């Protein structure tokens, strides 16, 4: 009886030891947090049953019972696709992550597995082909993009569908791009052609003292929001224009930038000495748009004053624009009247406690009358 128990114990120990055989995949993941690049090892493993190990040792080739294990492992590994680096706000701290894609090298892994089993080892290395994303965390670090620098936000609540569509299309074109050191950000160049072929739809734009429909109506929500982010980052302005009249979507008054290619553009220079990386985000429920700027820690502090508004003027007379949704004789309010006014915003940039630059945004707005849509045959259009 004692001999039988000893034999069973030895068999269980041997079985347990054999069951410990693992296929091991080792890699690493890089992150940026609080200005530091950190690399952390990751390990994944797949168990090979003792029966499969014994069968392999017996016939000196991989047992057919291992094939389903390799199939499942391959499916898991190949499902991992490369993901470019992005920053996310995690509990108030900005963290950059990416993901390297994997593809199982099945032949090399099988060779490692067979060799390890026949050598009496309890692990074998999984071999994968790695696909590093074009924009990796390490690339961000190499370019000096280690910190969250500034944020610009705006609210487009009340926008008609066409306007929201153009805002989201425009913002997506400015999501995840670099501004090289010394390079001038050029809004019109980055956005590219604005028409149906690039995803934009027709919407109202300010033209000829009233509203008219053109491709990309609402794109100024995008230019205004990224302007706010880059202005908060302390970048010098090389070109910026205000709208001809105050537009409610762009309050605070004067803290905005209109564009109308090719005559009006937004251009600002990256003078930080390192790359800047721009991310866009939007919330279609809250109707908010946001741009975040990431780069080097320049030691700058930027203070932007509230607008000082003067020189108020009464709204202008109403104007009319064709709208085929309106019945003859009727009218539809498209835009509300606005007073004329002048807004001045002051920006003070400090470094090391000393003022290094100071500038003002002066915006002069003409009086604006209500705009009504009327039937295209309406006499008020004459």
Please tell me what each predicted stretch does:
Residues 52-63, 216:
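Periplasmic/extracytosolic POTRA-like scaffold domains at the N-termini of outer-membrane
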Residues 6-7, 351:
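General helical structural elements
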Residues 9-18:
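Hydrophobic h-region of N-terminal signal peptides that target proteins for export
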Residues 26-30, 40-47, 64, 68, ...:
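Well-ordered beta-sheet/strand-loop patches within structured domains
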Residues 18-24:
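Cleaved targeting-peptide boundary
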Residues 33:
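Active-site-proximal acidic segments at structured loop/helix or strand boundaries
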Residues 1-4:
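Positively charged n-region of N-terminal signal peptides that target proteins for export
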């Amino acid at each position: 009886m004692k001999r039988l128990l000893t034999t069973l114990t030895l068999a269980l120990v041997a079985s347990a030891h054999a069951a410990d055989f693992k296929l091991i995949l080792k890699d690493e993941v890089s992150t940026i947090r609080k200005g530091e690049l950190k690399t952390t090892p990751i390990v994944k493993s797949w168990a090979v049953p003792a029966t499969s190990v014994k069968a392999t040792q017996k016939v000196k080739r991989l047992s057919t019972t291992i094939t389903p294990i390799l199939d499942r492992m391959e499916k898991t590994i190949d499902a991992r696709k490369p993901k470019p680096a992005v920053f996310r706000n995690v509990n108030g701290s900005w963290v950059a992550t990416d993901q390297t894609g994997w593809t199982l090298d099945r032949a090399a892994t099988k060779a490692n597995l067979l060799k390890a089993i026949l050598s009496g080892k309890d692990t074998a290395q999984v071999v994968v082909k790695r696909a590093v994303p074009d924009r990796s965390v390490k690339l961000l670090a190499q370019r000096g993009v280690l910190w969250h620098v500034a944020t610009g936000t705006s609210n487009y609540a009340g926008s008609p569908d066409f306007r929201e569509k153009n805002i989201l299309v425009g913002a997506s074109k400015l999501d995840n791009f670099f501004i090289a050191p010394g390079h001038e950000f050029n809004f019109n160049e980055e956005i590219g052609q604005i028409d149906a072929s690039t995803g934009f739809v027709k919407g109202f734009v300010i033209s000829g003292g009233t509203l008219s429909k053109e491709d990309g109506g609402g794109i100024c929500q995008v230019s205004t929001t990224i302007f706010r982010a880059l202005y908060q980052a302390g970048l010098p302005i090389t070109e910026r224009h205000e709208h001809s009249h105050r537009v409610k979507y762009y309050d605070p008054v004067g803290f905005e930038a209109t564009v109308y290619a090719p005559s009006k553009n937004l251009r600002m220079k990256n003078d930080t000495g390192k790359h800047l990386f721009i991310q866009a985000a939007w919330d279609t429920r809250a109707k908010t748009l946001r741009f975040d700027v990431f780069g080097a820690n320049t030691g700058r502090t930027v203070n932007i004053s509230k607008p000082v508004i003067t020189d108020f003027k009464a709204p202008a007379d109403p104007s009319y624009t064709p709208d085929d949704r309106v019945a003859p004789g009727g009218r539809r309010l498209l835009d509300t009247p606005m007073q004329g006014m002048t807004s001045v915003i002051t920006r003070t940039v400090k470094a090391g406690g000393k003022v290094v630059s100071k500038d003002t945004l002066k915006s002069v707005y003409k009086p604006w009358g209500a705009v009504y849509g009327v039937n295209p045959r309406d006499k008020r259009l004459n």
